Amino acid sequence: IPLSQHQVLYHKKQLSSTENGVNDFKFSPDEKKVIVIHSVKYGKRAVDSYPDLDKTTGRVINDAMYRHWDEWVEEIPQPFIYDFDGKTLSTHSVNILGDEPFECPMKPFGGIEQLAWSNDSKQIAYTCRKKTGLAYTASTDSDIYLYDLESGTTTNLCKPADYIAPEFDITRSLKDQAVNAFIKEGKDYNVGYDTNPQFSPDGKYIAWQSMERDGYESDRNRLCIYELATGNKFYVTELFQSNIDNYCWAKDSNTLFFVGTWHATTHVFATNLKGQIKRITDGQ
């Protein structure tokens, strides 16, 4: 078909045919695999426990976090890996979370930005708050995990392997919870929201947005950098006393650009790995 200048011919073709539909997706850099977010069944409805009451709308609730704003929690999003041959998705898939009953991406606002492919397509960094019930309701302690496709193993990048989360004490305020005492002790266990990982272009680092304290949904969002070779973590926006609303790596892997608001004006800033910050945009 002859096309005039600036015209593009699109050919639409269905690539997937999955029973659960597709909530979101992200192709690997080599385009041989794809992450697909499916909704999977979570918990039991009354009719599941009492099949003879197939018309019941009642619910048996014995734990917290049974509802998100305008919807009952009957399904949760989870990431599945499919092979892709350039034409269609494979019929077989692997759930990154295995049998774990957790959300990924996290509700209510999380999307595909909470998962990232490594540059060599061999690993996936993902965001997850691995809690249920009351602990899920009261805590904002999500972490960044690294999943290796070849071995099927998962590593928590935020906490040591022997970390055990303290029990939530309903008689204490959020500030006085044992989990937040780690901060006073100088232990950086990333006990607040940790979200939206991104690999550096050279593959040496993973960055993510990080809140310091557990239970504080409006805590300051910082940029945390994780060095894959050493396991060291450090923060590069400590001199910026406001939120990191969004960010991306520069091609040199030594600079990150981020969007932040200062004095009621939103601008683009840049920081290097030493935490030296400069404003890129000006005006209002």
Positions of PLM-derived features:
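Beta-propeller blade signature
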Residues: 2-4, 77-85, 141-151, 222-229, ...
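Residue-level detector of Asp-centered blade-edge/turn motifs that repeat once per structural unit
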Residues: 29-30, 119-120, 201-202, 251-252
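Hydrophobic beta-strand positions that form the internal "hydrophobic ladder"
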Residues: 34-35, 124, 203-206, 256
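Short glycine/acidic-enriched loop and turn motifs that connect beta-strands
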Residues: 41-44, 131-134, 212-216, 262-265
